[in-house]
UniProtKB/Swiss-Prot annotation:
Any Pfam family hit: TsaD
Matching CDD domains: ASKHA_NBD_TsaD_bac
Organism for this UniProt entry: Syntrophobacter fumaroxidans (strain DSM 10017 / MPOB)
UniProt keywords, alphabetically: Acyltransferase, Cytoplasm, Iron, Metal-binding, Transferase, tRNA processing
Entry's EC annotation: 2.3.1.234
Top class in the EC scheme: transferase
Protein name as annotated: tRNA N6-adenosine threonylcarbamoyltransferase
Segments traversing the membrane: none
Catalyzed reactions: L-threonylcarbamoyladenylate + adenosine(37) in tRNA = N(6)-L-threonylcarbamoyladenosine(37) in tRNA + AMP + H(+)
Residues reported in the UniProt entry to bind Fe cation: 111, 115, 307
GO cellular component: cytoplasm
Amino acid sequence: MIILGVESSCDETAAAVVEDGSRVLSDVVASQAALHGPYGGVVPELASRKHVEAILPVLGEAMHEAGVTWGQVDAIAATQGPGLVGALLVGLSAAKALAYALKKPMVAVNHLEGHIQAAFLGREELTRPFVCLVVSGGHTALYRVDPDGTTSFLGSTRDDAAGEAFDKVAKLLALGYPGGVEIERLAAGGDPHAFNFPRAFIDGRSLEFSFSGLKTSVATFVRQHGPPSESGEQGAYRLADLLASFQEAVVEVLVNKTVRAAGMCSVGDIAVVGGVAANLRLRERFEEEAGMHRFELHLPARRYCTDNAVMIAAAAYRTWKRSGFCLDPVDLDARSRWF
């Protein structure tokens, strides 16, 4: 079965053609990072306008790269939510139009379920339950996922998502957007134990997250100590040490709570997905914990951590296997909140 997937929930316009939920025939992503960089974050109105410009070229390129005709496509899939509603509408409307015009069945995909599916691309689906950490610029949440696809919410952030905290600290220090990539690069040369930043809800059984206090703590430190230096001369602090310490605080909380959730749910498998799952320090710490606690760790390839349409097409295939497609795409509408 060949599925054309479409993704436009935030600031990437993406399309992909995937066969049988795992064989990637094409994978096209048009990033808007340069557009939003001067603002230090995504501007929703600009994002939706850019999606309008990019959607048809991206769809055409995906079909050309896949080497298939429209007649060979068995179904259309698109992200329905959650995300920026104006951005979602562009990809969803394009997919609905294609499904209607070509008389193809369609499935609407939950963006977070797409991320979860990214951890198992090219692999067999788990036949046992697992705990999944979804961690990105817009989401930081824990779920229990059962073999039949049932997803149970375990806990999420009370304020900022982890990726949002990375972006806000990067903006504070004028590091550019997206901030996570630059912070990771600079933190690699720093001491993660140089500064003891707060870890919210780190003790006890809570599965909730909070990163606003950590972000504020970094801002307060910079305000009190002034700008960093490159080498730390004359008692000044190094930027690399500051960023490494901030990153370590985020990573410790994410790892601690995810492992705790797995223990509370009595499961032996953990998946970590979403844009922040591309962070090498986070992956390293989870791998260390997997070795210590003997759980099976499932990580997407780094290129599939950020938003893409491969995961949407793959998730649609799994949905079809479970319950079939939505045969009337006309009634589908974007959902800014879902789960």
